[in-house]
């Protein structure tokens, strides 16, 4: 029997609406041109599970599983159709990027893990953490925590000793801090100099030394900051030849006594005191004739005070410090680090700064107010770190060549600061490090003569560039520069005693000295004394033998034994063998009046020995005291 009713259209997936991932409903009628036309048997499109169960298999042909298998969590085995095959082909083409994506995810996870590990190490090793402005007021607790140490509320180490000291001061009424008046008054109040002279001294200090501690105006120096004020006057007094020696001596003793008390003050230390200590580290030898300060010890203790006092070491950039305060602290910190590294290498000692704090030095280069001088200090710090590592590597020095790879990389990195300008001392420091490494290697290598050309050549480079120093730049040169030049001259005395550069640099140092107590004068005397002793010993050796190199035999003799007693007065006429030392000096080095033009001499100045007179009637003086700076005791204003 044949059915005559209207045909029943089977319901299949092409008449159903599909809910896409974005939640909107799409009518299948609008997409029929993209669907296969005609009737498709359900068994051809159903999965293996639905065919076995003889149930409807509701699946999107672009999907990979039907709804039943998804709900039952079964593996859906769909038959391959032409459309699905084409779709799978495009899917597999896209799947080729999956491994690279997975590799990137694994790399990102590994990087995040390393960052988390480093952050944990920083938190554990850092003495302090960032502090918010709300913790700037002093707030004590039973654990002894306070905002003065720049601690974060999330990490406070226990400080029982600090707690006991604070409670002791509270219970017994003891003062925890000394004022400047408790330590020492200023030299004007003490009557050592009068106010007019102190004004001139401060002006001279600002002009030649203030840049080291970010002091650009005399108004920045107040008498209330006694240690800084006295130190500034002491530095300037070195270049006033007419100033009585007892006055300079009294200022020096006052500063030394104040430093001895300041160093034992409870931290934190004020900014002006750290500025004074930094200046004393730079000029520890030249400003004190009575009782020299050890720059290595002084810089080490000052660095410990700075670690507690400087906020930028304990906080992240952009904290409560103003840009000018941050720049001043960064500049002081870098200068202290440089003096510590200078003294460690020059004295054969260790460095008392942790690596993480030295790594803070380049931060100053990111500041908008950084100067080329700041960059030079950072370059010196990196240079001396390299030299110290090489100096303590015996294996490297035993087989050392004329060049070191680390120093060459440093030279390439800082080539823009290495100039032949006489005012720049960066080249002097590089050659000094090379000279020290070459001489150390020569002691360890059996064939020491192999490095002799490098040693003498480097010493000549140092002296040659130093002879180009302008007279107006000489006062600002730190003690370490004079040590470099003196060591280069002594090196030439060791190997080439007749080198004319020895006499030239000796005369040049004497010409720079405004007085007999100046460091350049003393180094010139030392070089002259060593040259004299070598000359005498060489003459004795040459008379007793016919050696081709008398100086080489003299080096093995006892040149500086106990038989040579200290002489309080040293006559330069005995030290200088000929006046040719001044013949090749750079023109323009006549007297100290060039530093302060417009002043006339009113006192007898320091005079060089007769040996340095270019003619019997013309003398070369070391300077003159400006009439406006003569103390009352010497001149009636």
From Swiss-Prot:
Keywords: DNA-binding, Metal-binding, Nucleus, Transcription, Transcription regulation, Zinc. It comes from the Eukaryota. Disulfide bonds: none annotated. It is found in: Nucleus. SMART domains: GAL4 (SM00066). It holds the Pfam family Zn_clus. Residues 127-153 are annotated as: Disordered. Residues 127-145 have a biased composition (Polar residues). InterPro entries: prtT, Zn2-C6_fun-type_DNA-bd_sf, Zn2Cys6_DnaBD. GO terms for cellular component: nucleus. Residues 47-76 bind DNA. SUPFAM superfamilies: Zn2/Cys6 DNA-binding domain. GO terms for molecular function: DNA-binding transcription factor activity, RNA polymerase II-specific; transcription cis-regulatory region binding; zinc ion binding. Belongs to the prtT family. Transcription factor required for protein utilization and degradation. Regulates transcription of major secreted proteases. This is Transcriptional activator of proteases prtT.
């Amino acid at each position: 029997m044949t059915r005559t009713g209207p045909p029943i259209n089977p319901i299949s997936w092409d008449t159903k609406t599909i809910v896409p991932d974005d939640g909107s409903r799409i009518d299948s009628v609008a997409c029929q041109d993209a669907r296969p036309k005609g009737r498709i048997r359900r068994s051809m499109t159903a999965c293996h599970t639905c065919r076995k169960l003889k149930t409807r298999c509701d699946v999107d042909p672009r999907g990979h599983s039907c709804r039943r298998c998804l709900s039952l969590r079964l593996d859906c085995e769909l038959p391959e159709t032409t459309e699905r095959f084409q779709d799978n082909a495009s899917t597999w083409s896209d799947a080729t990027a999956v491994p690279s994506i997975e590799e990137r995810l694994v790399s990102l996870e590994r990087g995040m893990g390393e960052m988390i590990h480093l952050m944990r190490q920083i938190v554990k090793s850092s003495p302090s953490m960032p502090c918010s402005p709300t913790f700037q007021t002093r707030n004590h607790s039973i654990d002894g925590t306070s905002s003065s140490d720049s601690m974060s509320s999330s990490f406070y180490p226990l400080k029982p000793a600090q707690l006991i000291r604070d409670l002791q001061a509270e219970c017994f009424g003891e003062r925890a801090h000394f004022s400047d008046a408790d330590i020492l008054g200023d030299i004007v109040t003490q009557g050592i100099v009068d106010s007019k002279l102190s004004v001139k001294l401060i002006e001279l200090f600002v002009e030649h030394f203030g840049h080291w501690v970010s002091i650009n105006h005399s108004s920045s120096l107040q008498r209330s900051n006694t240690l800084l004020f006295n130190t500034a006057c002491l530095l300037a007094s070195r270049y006033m030849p007419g100033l009585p020696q007892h006055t300079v001596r009294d200022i020096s003793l006052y500063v030394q006594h104040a430093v001895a008390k300041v160093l034992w003050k409870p931290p934190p230390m004020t900014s002006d005191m750290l500025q004074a200590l930094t200046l004393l580290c730079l000029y520890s030898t030249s400003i004190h004739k009575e009782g020299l300060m050890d720059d290595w010890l002084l810089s080490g203790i000052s660095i410990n005070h700075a670690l507690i006092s400087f906020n930028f070491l304990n906080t992240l950039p952009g904290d409560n410090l103003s840009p000018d305060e941050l720049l001043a602290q960064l500049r002081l910190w870098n200068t202290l680090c440089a003096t510590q590294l200078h003294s460690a290498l020059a004295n054969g000692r260790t460095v008392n700064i942790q690596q993480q704090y030295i790594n803070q030095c380049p931060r100053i280069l990111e500041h908008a107010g950084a100067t080329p001088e700041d960059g030079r200090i950072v370059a010196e710090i990196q240079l001396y770190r390299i030299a110290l590592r090489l100096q303590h590597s015996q294996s490297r020095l035993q087989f050392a060549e004329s060049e070191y790879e680390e120093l060459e990389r440093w030279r390439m990195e800082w080539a823009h600061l290495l100039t032949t300008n006489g005012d720049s001392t960066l080249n002097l420091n590089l050659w000094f490090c090379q000279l020290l490494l070459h001489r150390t290697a020569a002691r360890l290598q059996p064939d020491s003569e192999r490095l002799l050309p490098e040693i003498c050549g480097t010493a000549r480079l140092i002296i040659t560039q130093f002879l180009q120093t302008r007279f107006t730049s000489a006062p600002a040169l730190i003690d370490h520069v004079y040590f470099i030049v003196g060591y280069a001259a002594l090196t030439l005395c060791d190997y080439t005693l007749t080198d004319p550069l020895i006499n030239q640099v000796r005369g040049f140092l004497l010409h720079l000295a405004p007085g007999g107590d100046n460091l350049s004068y003393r180094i010139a005397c030392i070089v002259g004394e060593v040259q004299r002793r070598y000359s005498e010993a060489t003459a004795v050796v040459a008379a007793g033998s016919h050696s081709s190199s008398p100086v080489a035999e003299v080096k093995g003799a006892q040149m500086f034994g106990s038989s040579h007693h200290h002489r309080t007065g040293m006559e330069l006429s005995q030290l200088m063998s000929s006046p040719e030392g001044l013949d090749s000096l750079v023109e323009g080095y006549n007297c100290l009046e060039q530093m302060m033009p417009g002043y006339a001499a009113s006192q007898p100045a320091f005079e060089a020995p007769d040996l340095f007179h270019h003619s019997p009637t013309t003398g070369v003086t070391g300077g003159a005291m400006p009439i406006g700076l003569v103390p009352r005791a010497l001149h009636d204003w």
